[in-house]
Amino acid sequence: MSQPAKVLLLYAHPESQDSVANRVLLKPATQLSNVTVHDLYAHYPDFFIDIPREQALLREHEVIVFQHPLYTYSCPALLKEWLDRVLSRGFASGPGGNQLAGKYWRSVITTGEPESAYRYDALNRYPMSDVLRPFELAAGMCRMHWLSPIIIYWARRQSAQELASHARAYGDWLANPLPPGGR
């Protein structure tokens, strides 16, 4: 039996201590030998990102998971800075920028609103697939495979049992993250 794919889980939450949902989701990831959990706010509280180190981490993993809350229809500021600086031209895109080609990108998002708020006729005016389009485009720019996002809607209002169920499913996926024929 082959080894599971190496997963780099980039976790970005500026107030992690207050996010029960994200803490519960992270727990199974920390127990898997094929997963490297990398807390960006813990490593870079000053926003000075070690770009060569981050690019080396990306090279060492097949699956890159971006776990974060949805902030103003995007990601927290440090993750945006990370995306802009680390996924640079010549490394991840443009001429010679093929270091991530063929790898997998998956977004794991928590929201503060119910799924019903993400429709053309609802509060946010757009479905989540439209809101996450910039991330899908970034994956394409890097020549990565875009995997369907995992979205925990209205994370604060999930019961302990619901969060545990999400965490189990997430942990099961992390243990074997590639689709059939993915390698």
Swiss-Prot record:
It is a peripheral membrane protein. Its EC number is 1.6.5.2. It comes from the Bacteria. Pfam families: Flavodoxin_2. GO terms for molecular function: electron transfer activity; FMN binding; NADH:ubiquinone reductase (non-electrogenic) activity; NADPH dehydrogenase (quinone) activity. It catalyses: a quinone + NADH + H(+) = a quinol + NAD(+); a quinone + NADPH + H(+) = a quinol + NADP(+). Keywords: Cell inner membrane, Cell membrane, Membrane, NAD, Oxidoreductase. GO terms for cellular component: plasma membrane. Belongs to the NAD(P)H dehydrogenase (quinone) family. KefG subfamily. Regulatory subunit of a potassium efflux system that confers protection against electrophiles. Required for full activity of KefB. This is Glutathione-regulated potassium-efflux system ancillary protein KefG. It comes from Escherichia coli (strain ATCC 8739 / DSM 1576 / NBRC 3972 / NCIMB 8545 / WDCM 00012 / Crooks). The gene is kefG.
